[in-house]
Amino acid sequence: MVAGIHSLLLLQFYQILLSGCTGLVPEEGKRKYSESTRSSPQQSQQVLDQFELRLLNMFGLKRRPTPGKNVVIPPYMLDLYHLHSAQLADDQGSSEVDYHMERAASRANTVRSFHHEESMEEIPESGEKTIQRFFFNLSSIPDEELVTSSELRIFREQVQEPFKTDGSKLHRINIYDIVKPAAAASRGPVVRLLDTRLIHHNESKWESFDVTPAITRWIAHKQPNHGFVVEVTHLDNDTNVPKRHVRISRSLTLDKGHWPRIRPLLVTFSHDGKGHALHKRQKRQARHKQRKRLKSSCRRHPLYVDFSDVGWNDWIVAPPGYHAFYCHGECPFPLADHLNSTNHAIVQTLVNSVNTNIPKACCVPTELSAISMLYLDENEKVVLKNYQDMVVEGCGCR
């Protein structure tokens, strides 16, 4: 049961925020809201639940996420969020977000991350090779989303032992799509090479591999998902070089808290056909010089939505809240230029001055902008998504 103050805050949030979103709350819902202020606590809770469900649907969620306490947010997803929220620190060199990833996000408005299922057994080492099979459950990707790009990210640690710099200390990482799993009589699965990389042991960093063809085959073409094979080939026979520096599986000596931060990560970039891509900034109109106006006239008012106040901070990772603003005020006759009115609003206001049965023009948002949100979905998958029309940039009489 939601506490009384919590219910009031959430209902007020819906009333103000959704008042600027045409069609988001039907007239019946608005009537129920006004009636809820006079109804019993049980009826108020029902109205609250209906509002919450409608807003969750706007976010593309079927139910309110209830993530566990041990869910780890990949640092890479936080970097992406800060990048697209223009909140990165000046020193961007330490960020794992590179140009290639920014370009991938330029065609998407949604980024999803997936960890592999660790039930898969490691394929025994064969000579100079370490081979691991990975399976990622992608069932949480909605059918209406078009996956535009996908990356498999693997962490490699710097080798601490002294080594030569003549290029002999190299590993090759090959990523394969399992087209057909191994049959009982066959020697191994049928695979297709997706990407390959020659790496040195000289630094700790993430390596990104393009696996878009496999994800497209699984999602768009509805073909079976048998996972990937990651093959690490050691190009030298120096036993002093640890072969576990490429982190494709968890070692027994590794700290339990450290493994979730360096385990392999599959990242998909997709677009649901709504709004703009993540990297595209909607150009905001230049603010005109503020004219002296009546305090009661139509204008933008401050409204800060704090997700902890409405009880959503357990699944919304970032931002903790945002400035939504709202429009309120009179549209008096005659309509002044600074009220950003349409010709129809001017005519309607003129008619209202002689016939009060015709309502005045309304103070509504005339310009809205998007925000990026990083959250955990119903399946505890980390999602970064661009949501349109979340911030009021301008108001006018319409």
Curated annotation (Swiss-Prot):
Residues 24-284 form a propeptide. Disulfide bonds join C298-C363, C327-C395, C331-C397. Belongs to the TGF-beta family. One of its GO terms (cellular component) is extracellular space. Induces cartilage and bone formation. Glycans are attached at N137, N202, N237, N340. SUPFAM superfamilies: Cystine-knot cytokines. GO terms for molecular function: cytokine activity; growth factor activity. Pfam families: TGF_beta (PF00019), TGFb_propeptide (PF00688). Keywords: Chondrogenesis, Cleavage on pair of basic residues, Cytokine, Developmental protein, Differentiation, Disulfide bond, Glycoprotein, Growth factor, Osteogenesis, Secreted, Signal. SMART domains: TGFB (SM00204). It comes from Xenopus laevis (African clawed frog). This is Bone morphogenetic protein 2-B. Homodimer; disulfide-linked. The lineage of its organism: Eukaryota, Metazoa, Chordata, Craniata, Vertebrata. GO terms for biological process: cartilage development; cell differentiation; ossification. It is found in: Secreted. Its main location: secreted. Residues 1-23 form the signal peptide.
